[in-house]
Amino acid sequence: MSRWWNSNSQFASDIEKATSETLPAGSEEISLYLEISDQIRSKSVDPKFAMRILKSRIDHSNPNVQIMALKLTDTCVKNGGSGFLLEIASREFMDNLVSILRSPAGIDEDVKMVILRYIQSWALAVPDTNSPLSYIIHVYQNLKDGDYEFPEPSQNITSKFLDTETPPDWTDSEVCLRCRTPFTFTNRKHHCRNCGGVFCNQCSSKTLSLPHLGINQPVRVCDSCYSLRTKPKGSKSRARNERKFHAKTRKTPSKPVTNNEDEDIKRAIELSLKEMPQSREPPSYERPSEANVVISQDQHLTEDEDEELKRAIAISLEEAQKSSQKDDNVTAPNNMNISYPSVPAHTVSTDIRSSPFSGRPSDNPSTLISTADADNITLYATLVQKLKKLPPGSIFTEYQLQELHENMGVMRTRMMRSLGETMSKYNGLIQALQKLQTCMRLNDALIEQRLSSTYAHHYIDSSMDSNRSIEPEPDVISTVRNSSTIPQASSSSVPKIVVDSSPVTENPPSHSDVMGQKDTISSYYSTDTDVSANVMGNRHDEVVFSDTASGEKNTKLNIDESTNYYNTDSIDKVGEPFDEISSGYDDLMNGNDKQGNDIPEVQEASLIEL
């Protein structure tokens, strides 16, 4: 847009230079006049903008400037083309000339005569009153009826004065007008500046200047126009045939051809369209087969081809290859299951297909971008970038860019709506994810609580079992050597005593060995107190003996060592009456048995509570 404004500024400066106040009267620069008219005819400058610049110079207060501006306007009318003629024939320009003629402040006679002469010549050159230029005739008749005297025309004026060959309007087609190749994202459209037809790059790769159209710089032309403009003169009939061919082609651009080659191309296109839904590639880029077409076409690119377009195509192809590789890596089996670790009474197994949050393709077509939309976006961006390098005013000749601009507005609305829907879905998924995380945390806490209670209960049960298993039996140890037996009571409530008659095979541990143990019996037993029968029958006590016969007095023994040292029998092996155990018990406590032998002194021990 800045280039377009700069081009308009340059055009305004050229007009100001051609109608400068410093120029003497009658010293018009015809070459500059023709250059300005060529800019208008080549559509490098908007005709309306050119008309308003000339109108501002005609309204100048200097009569010399007004006359030169009128002469420049007449030159542009005869050489500027039909677009500029329509602007001159508008009410804006013609009414301004009438207002100058009828100015209350008066008007210079030379300026008045120049205005009347040009209005008369333009009106006489208009072929018909029904033409778009008929307002010039209407103004001419009103001035003629208003007692304005027009000068006699210096020559016979016909409509040929206004016939100017201008660049044709561009046509559109889905196939190349020369080779009938369909246009795609990579096979772009190109318009011939001479005939206005649309061709592919191979059929319009040549450039040529067109001075008869006011285009002095080399521009793109098709091969047919290039051969017509460069061949020797003398073949006018062939040139007319070529013009007729282009005219017929523009009228029927999509007319099918009947030869076998075109039919094969059509069948190939239909097959490719049928295979397109089965393709796994995203719709935003072309298939590899079209990439090969790009490579083959890039070999025929000429120096005038836009380098930025080449880079854009190369980048798009690289992105297409990367996207295809990512799709191959991401694709996974649809029947894949996810199983979580098992815990007691809790087993979780989910299926991706049954998950409400599993990734599924959207069925809403408004959220998808078709291949045509992606191509239009890329083409629009490419044309905008290319417009910066084109000559000033080329934006008015880029009709395709204007159409794409309108399409971008509609597409922007659709994409904004799709973006809103996508954001709503995203927010919903975020909320669902937060709820899922909360549920997972609660589930983990419940599992940990249940495991803790289970382990604690198991620990208590095992402790109780161990206490029962290690509780000492109320057995009384004896080392009577004469194998005398003391009768035991059958009741389980009274301690029962069994006397072991086996001889002692080894000496009890010494005092120094017992004191070296970690858990000694000295802290739990008292060797100075006698044990009564009643206390012995009511408490489960562990006892130690001092064997006077062995030579050691009151030796303190460890519990484990004493158990290993003496032979102990369970109380269940004895079933003697209670009266016999009472008498035997009294004798044992007094230190004598029935045979009169000495008995080791029995000392009371405190029960170790486990």
Swiss-Prot record:
Zn(2+) 1 binds at residues 176, 179, 200, 203. GO terms for cellular component: cytosol; endosome membrane; ESCRT-0 complex; fungal-type vacuole membrane; nucleus; prospore membrane. Gene3D superfamilies: 1.20.5.1940, 1.25.40.90, 6.10.140.100, Zinc/RING finger domain, C3HC4 (zinc finger). Residues 229-264, 340-369, 482-517 are annotated as: Disordered. Residues 260-279, 304-323 form the UIM domain. CDD domains: FYVE_spVPS27p_like, GAT_Vps27, VHS_Vps27. Keywords: Cytoplasm, Endosome, Membrane, Metal-binding, Repeat, Zinc, Zinc-finger. Pfam families: FYVE, UIM, VHS, Vps27_GAT-like. The keyword Hydrolase does not apply. It is a peripheral membrane protein. Zn(2+) 2 binds at residues 192, 195, 222, 225. One of its GO terms (molecular function) is ubiquitin binding. The keyword Transmembrane helix does not apply. Residues 347-369, 482-494 have a biased composition (Polar residues). Residues 20-151 form the VHS domain. Component of the ESCRT-0 complex composed of hse1 and sst4. Component of the ESCRT-0 complex which is the sorting receptor for ubiquitinated cargo proteins at the multivesicular body (MVB) and recruits ESCRT-I to the MVB outer membrane. PANTHER family: VACUOLAR PROTEIN SORTING-ASSOCIATED PROTEIN 27. This is Vacuolar protein sorting-associated protein 27.
